[in-house]
UniProtKB/Swiss-Prot annotation:
GO terms for molecular function: damaged DNA binding; DNA-directed DNA polymerase activity; magnesium ion binding. This is DNA polymerase IV. SUPFAM superfamilies: DNA/RNA polymerases, Lesion bypass DNA polymerase (Y-family), little finger domain. The gene is dinB. Its cofactor is Mg(2+). The record marks F23 as: Substrate discrimination. It comes from Streptococcus pyogenes serotype M1. Poorly processive, error-prone DNA polymerase involved in untargeted mutagenesis. Copies undamaged DNA at stalled replication forks, which arise in vivo from mismatched or misaligned primer ends. These misaligned primers can be extended by PolIV. Exhibits no 3'-5' exonuclease (proofreading) activity. May be involved in translesional synthesis, in conjunction with the beta clamp from PolIII. GO terms for biological process: DNA-templated DNA replication; error-prone translesion synthesis; SOS response. Monomer. Mg(2+) binds at D18, D116.
Length: 364
């Protein structure tokens, strides 16, 4: 029995762009000697006593089973010849900005999901090009010619299918999913490939005998809702290629933050304050980029024993002034009870964000 009507908007033209092994690709571009070698973005475990995690890695390293969020120690054990690079996140952010400017040539309806991926609605694009596939090819060409990097593209009538399509043929692939092909495309996919279906849901689906899109398609809507609640409603529609979520070019950010984990524990106040300052500068730069001001400053401290303290202060006025944020973050740290254990993580976050007002100038 169908609980809610199925409304499927197939009139849109959506592109999902996903940069190929982005951080590692930037490093290879800037150091051609790395090409063809397994490259891991993360601290070298031989220098950190085995601590640290993999941020990302190139396709050569993935042949050894290395993946993001894996411990650096395990990555080294899988591939002792891997080249570990700590990463230059300011450089990656600059390259990401270049890529976003390329997107904007074609449409202003761009929804960045992270530094290396974004959705574009090109239904009504700036150049009046009718073919979304042609636009995707032009974007791939522009990024390669101007930035020296490859990306994969997925094209379809909604974000869900475009995202799946971009992951279908990597690296440097382009996959189109038409409305008449959607059910066949989804039927063959393992359920864990469905974007938005996490590990816990995958296990639950497997327990129900659901392993592929075809299996999911056969399950009644009410059964899915009984097992998954509101998410069951979404699953029923995703199995049918239905997802009407718009591309949101003005995604609302609830917070902007920066945190760092330290392989070598911090003990000295001067070192701690210096690291707080680095985080603050990163936050201030992000506030500037996103044209945001904030009122609440949050300091996060994690000690060697994994005790984590979070404390916040709300200011009377909006700000994005780095010196002001740093002063408050430093005061918050000074107010914490002394802990002889070294610090392994520091984070600074700005919340209660609002759009920048033209007559406020607090970033001098």
């Amino acid at each position: 029995m169908l609980i809610f009507p199925l409304i499927n908007d197939t009139s849109r033209k959506i592109i999902h762009i996903d940069m190929d092994a982005f951080f590692a690709a930037v490093e290879e571009r800037d150091n051609p000697a790395l090409k063809g070698k397994p490259v891991v973005i993360g601290k070298d475990p031989r220098e950190t006593g085995g601590r640290g995690v993999v941020s990302t890695c190139n396709y050569e390293a993935r042949k050894y089973g290395i993946h993001s969020a894996m411990s650096s120690k395990e990555a080294y054990e899988r591939c002792p010849k891997a080249i570990f690079i700590s990463g230059n996140y300011e450089k990656y952010r600059t390259v990401g900005d270049q890529i976003r400017r390329i997107f904007k040539r074609y449409t202003d309806v761009v929804e960045p999901m992270s530094i290396d991926e974004a959705y574009l609605d090109v239904t009504d694009n700036k150049l009046g090009i009718k073919s979304a596939v042609k636009i995707a090819k032009l974007i791939q060409h522009d990024i390669w010619k101007e930035v020296g990097l490859t990306c994969s593209a997925g094209v379809s009538y909604n974000k869900f299918l475009a995202k799946l399509a971009s992951d279908f043929e990597k690296p440097h692939g382009l996959t189109l999913v038409l409305k008449e092909d959607a059910l066949c495309f989804l039927a063959k996919l393992p359920i864990e490939k469905f974007h938005g279906v996490g590990k816990k849901s995958v296990k639950k689906l497997h327990d129900m005998g659901i392993y592929t899109g075809q299996d999911l398609l056969a399950v009644p809507e009410m059964t899915l809702i009984d097992h998954f609640g509101r998410f069951g409603f979404d699953l029923y529609r995703k199995a049918r290629g239905i997802s009407n979520s718009p591309v949101k070019s003005d995604r609302i950010r609830k917070s902007i933050g920066s945190e760092r984990t330290y392989a070598k524990l911090l003990y000295q106040e001067t070192d701690i304050k210096a690291e707080i300052s680095k985080n603050v500068k990163r936050v201030a730069a992000l506030l500037q980029d996103h044209k945001k001001l904030g009122k609440t400053i949050v300091l996060k401290v994690r000690y060697a024993d994994f005790t984590t303290l979070t404390k916040r202060v709300t200011l009377p006025e909006l700000t994005r002034n780095a010196a002001q944020i740093e002063q408050v973050a430093g005061d918050i740290f000074d107010s914490l009870s002394e802990n002889p254990a070294g610090i392994r993580l520091l984070g600074v976050t700005m919340t209660n964000l609002e759009d920048k007002v033209a007559d406020i100038s607090l970033d001098l």
